[in-house]
Every structure is written in C-alpha cells, then in structure tokens.
Curated annotation (Swiss-Prot):
Protein name: Transmembrane protein 138
Alphabetical UniProt keywords: Cell projection, Cilium, Cilium biogenesis/degradation, Glycoprotein, Membrane, Transmembrane, Transmembrane helix, Vacuole
UniProt organism field: Bos taurus
Gene: TMEM138
Transmembrane segments: 7-27, 41-61, 80-100, 115-134
Biological process terms in GO annotation: cilium assembly
Length: 162
C-alpha cells in the first residue's frame, strides 16, 4: 500500500515534472536563437513526460486492484489518461524533431510552415488536456479504495464480469 508520506513525495515529484513541462511549453520559443539550449530543454521535457508515464504505471502496479488481477478495471477507469499521455508524448517528440530540423542550421530565421503550425497547435492543446487528466489521475490514485479490499471493489468486479 502506498503510505501517505510516500504518496505525498510521489505526487510532489509528478507535479514538479508537470511544472517543468508547462515551463518548457511556455518559454521554449524564446530560446530559438540558442538551438543547443532549446534541444537540451526538449530532451529533458521528453524524459520528464516519460518519467511521468513510468510513475503513473508504478502507481497502478502498487494498487490492490492490480494485485488482485483486475487490470481491466484499472484500464477502464484510466484509459483516457493512458491514451492521452501516449498521444501527447508522440506529439511532443514529433514537434521537437520538426522544430530542431527546421531551425538548427539557421536559428535567426523565423520558420513556421503550415504543418509545423498545425502540429504546434495540436501539441499545445494536448498539453492542456494531458496536465488536467494526469493530475486528476494522480490524485484519484490516492483514494484508499484502490489499496484495500472493499465493497466498492467487489461491486466494480461484478460489473466488469457482466
């Protein structure tokens, strides 16, 4: 079971990684004149998203629901977050690769192709949804019902079996 002190530490780490993601999304365009710094920020951002994915799955694995073999129940409850996180991760990597390819050799030019603008908008939209759903999932996983046998779990199990 995830103890309160450990949960607070894990939640703080998740929020720190989300804050870094928000920071890079907000201010990375200001550093387009320094492509090496922008590249490092993008790499760290992608690693932070990957760490958040790992942390959320470790939290899933730590639940009584998962240990009882009800993986389908967890997936059903949190599939939106799982899918959105994967989509956001793919969009972020795509945007970072595209931006670095266009601006690496000539960082003085302000290059925005139609495709890049479209990808930029979708990545930023996905970022907002990712932050909301990820925070909601992280907080919901603090519910004690996920860490012990309960009437709620038995009722959910019966609904899944139908």
């Amino acid at each position: 079971m995830l103890q309160t002190s450990n949960y607070s530490l894990v939640l703080s780490l998740q929020f720190l990684l989300l804050s870094y993601d928000l920071f890079v999304n907000s201010f990375s365009e200001l550093l387009r004149m320094a492509p090496v710094i922008q590249l490092v920020l993008f790499i760290i951002q992608d690693i932070a998203i990957l760490f958040n994915i790992i942390i959320i799955f470790l939290m899933f694995f730590n639940t009584f629901v998962f240990q009882a073999g009800l993986v389908n129940l967890l997936f059903h409850k949190f599939k939106g977050t799982i899918i959105l996180t994967a989509v956001y991760f793919a969009l972020s990597i795509s945007l970072h690769v595209w931006v670095m390819n266009l601006r690496w050799k000539n960082s003085n030019c302000f290059v925005w192709t139609d495709g890049l603008q479209t990808l930029f908008v979708f990545q930023r939209l996905a970022a907002v949804l990712y932050c909301y759903f990820y925070k909601r999932t992280a907080v919901r996983l603090g519910d004690p019902r996920f860490y012990q046998d309960s009437l709620w779990l038995r009722m959910e199990f019966m609904q899944v079996r139908r």
